[in-house]
Swiss-Prot record:
Stored InterPro entries: NHR-like_dom_sf (IPR035500), NR5-like (IPR016355), Nucl_hrmn_rcpt_lig-bd (IPR000536), Nuclear_hrmn_rcpt (IPR001723), Znf_hrmn_rcpt (IPR001628), Znf_NHR/GATA (IPR013088)
Positions bearing N6-acetyllysine: 34, 38, 72
Designated gene of the protein: NR5A1
Keyword Membrane: no
Bias type Pro residues, positions: 205-216
UniProt name for this protein: Steroidogenic factor 1
Function: Transcriptional activator. Seems to be essential for sexual differentiation and formation of the primary steroidogenic tissues. Binds to the Ad4 site found in the promoter region of steroidogenic P450 genes such as CYP11A, CYP11B and CYP21B. Also regulates the AMH/Muellerian inhibiting substance gene as well as the AHCH and STAR genes. 5'-YCAAGGYC-3' and 5'-RRAGGTCA-3' are the consensus sequences for the recognition by NR5A1. The SFPQ-NONO-NR5A1 complex binds to the CYP17 promoter and regulates basal and cAMP-dependent transcriptional activity.
GO-annotated biological processes: female gonad development; hormone-mediated signaling pathway; male gonad development; positive regulation of gene expression; sex determination; tissue development
Length: 463
């Protein structure tokens, strides 16, 4: 049985991108994909792919590879059990309640889009949420439950507002610095010489770059997950490989530094190596890899500390222990140790960070939302500072649309989740800004190891 839908939502078929005609076999699809799916199931057809089982499926070439087209039908959530075995017209009526529920979600989504002033035809572009005065946690030392008062971040000054509310930074960035060298595909290694051993290469043989896990499963087990989020899941760095590389780096003796590094110095080294994995991740991201290096640098120099903070916070959500924080190396640090050894400012920052961990935990943020939010952070700079405005703006709108669609579909009982997640991004921005200030003052005092990517990023906004 086919069900009508609201045409003013201007839905596109999740399989091929054609205009949808109604609800067919579990979700909104076009007539062509509806008929293809029905014939495939009823006739028990088996296809093979002559390429690598990764063919592009769109309106113009959806008939070229039936194997990949059918796999995509299953991936986006079309239901095998909804096809009638008796070859009669109409789907199975037991899916009626599901269609009605989906229609209700579409109505709710439409209302939310209109309430936030998003564009219906291209997906939402982020409007700024209410500003909040959240003091923040350091990018390198967050952790700990509780809420301790901390001095608020300074006024934005000449900062410009990014697409989800908090300020971005206007920058005139040269394309010849160390980060530029690292971003060029022809120079994948570090272009600056660190006082610490290079984890990517040794005098004897080059080490492989940070590894990525096998592609995230994208079959029928993940129905209703937007394609952008599926791609981002595939690009997530492997936590085990990152842990092993950082541990190896920490265990090697420091060149020209016979003295034992301080705990804070070790934390900075962890952050520096994590930052390299973040750059590797960004280089592989859809849209980002299509930008010119100058634009890539502007984006990374704008959001590097946010990505570090967010990476740490999500690790604590997965860790799930209130009395300790989990480092990227897999080591646990008791909060009592932090309280005893850290200064008052650092301790208050740690407590503020853990409060954000608790907020996101209460929102039940999952891995799909995490990767989408991380992508939004990467593209948080106001597009007017970029050469390729259109590409970056398109990335922002697609990510917002994907996150809204995902939260509405998978958390219909939390109708406000999309907005709440964006508010948390504003807090992450605030946290990272204060963390940068803390780290910069530590650097001026000689407590942060010099000549590395972390220091380069610290100076980027101050040049």
């Amino acid at each position: 049985m086919d069900y009508s839908y609201d045409e003013d939502l201007d839905e596109l078929c999740p399989v091929c991108g054609d205009k949808v005609s109604g609800y067919h076999y579990g979700l909104l699809t076009c007539e062509s994909c509806k008929g293809f799916f029905k014939r495939t199931v009823q006739n028990n057809k088996h296809y093979t792919c002559t390429e690598s089982q990764n063919c592009k499926i769109d309106k113009t070439q959806r008939k070229r590879c039936p194997y990949c087209r059918f796999q995509k039908c299953l991936t986006v959530g079309m239901r095998l059990e909804a096809v009638r075995a008796d070859r009669m017209r109409g789907g199975r009526n037991k899916f009626g309640p599901m269609y009605k529920r989906d229609r209700a979600l579409k109505q709710q989504k439409k209302a939310l889009i209109r309430a936030n002033g998003f564009k219906l035809e291209t997906g939402p572009s982020m409007g700024p949420p209410p500003q909040t005065d959240y003091p923040l946690a350091p990018a390198l030392h967050p952790g700990a439950k509780g809420l301790a008062p901390a001095p608020p971040a300074g006024p934005p000054g000449d900062y410009e507002r990014g697409p989800y509310g908090p300020p971005g930074v206007p920058m005139a960035v040269p394309t010849h610095g160390p980060l530029a060298g690292y971003l060029y595909p022809a120079f994948p290694g570090r272009a600056i010489k660190s006082e610490y051993p290079e984890p990517y290469a040794s005098p004897h043989e080059p080490a492989p770059p940070y590894g990525y896990p096998e592609p995230y499963p994208s079959g029928p087990g993940l129905p209703g997950v937007p394609e952008l989020i599926l791609k981002l899941l595939q690009l997530e760095p492997d936590e085990g490989q990152l842990k092993a590389r950082i541990l190896a780096c920490l265990q090697e003796p420091s060149k020209g530094r016979p003295d034992r590094p301080t705990p804070f110095g070790l934390m900075c080294k962890m952050a520096d190596q994590t930052l390299f994995s973040i750059v590797e991740w960004a280089r592989s991201c859809v849209v980002f890899k299509e930008l010119e290096v100058a634009d890539q640098m502007k984006l990374l120099q704008n959001c590097w500390s946010e990505l570090l903070v967010f990476d740490h916070i999500y690790r604590q959500i997965q860790h799930g222990k209130e009395g300790s924080i989990l480092l990227v190396t897999g080591q646990e640090v008791d909060l009592s140790t932090v309280a005893a050894q850290a200064g008052s400012l650092l301790h208050s920052l740690v407590l503020r960070a853990q409060d954000l961990v608790q907020q996101l935990h209460s929102l039940q943020v999952d891995r799909q939302e995490f990767v989408c939010l991380k992508f939004l952070i990467l593209f948080s700079l106001d597009v007017k500072f970029l050469e390729n405005h259109g590409l970056a703006k398109d990335a922002q709108e697609k990510a917002n649309s994907a996150l809204l669609e995902y939260t509405m579909c998978h958390y219909p009982h939390c109708g406000d989740k999309f907005r709440q997640l964006l508010l948390r991004l504003a807090e992450v921005r605030s946290l990272s800004m204060q963390a940068e200030e803390y780290l910069y003052h530590k650097h001026l005092g000689g407590e942060v190891p010099c000549n590395n990517l972390l220091i380069e990023m610290l100076h980027a906004k101050r040049t």
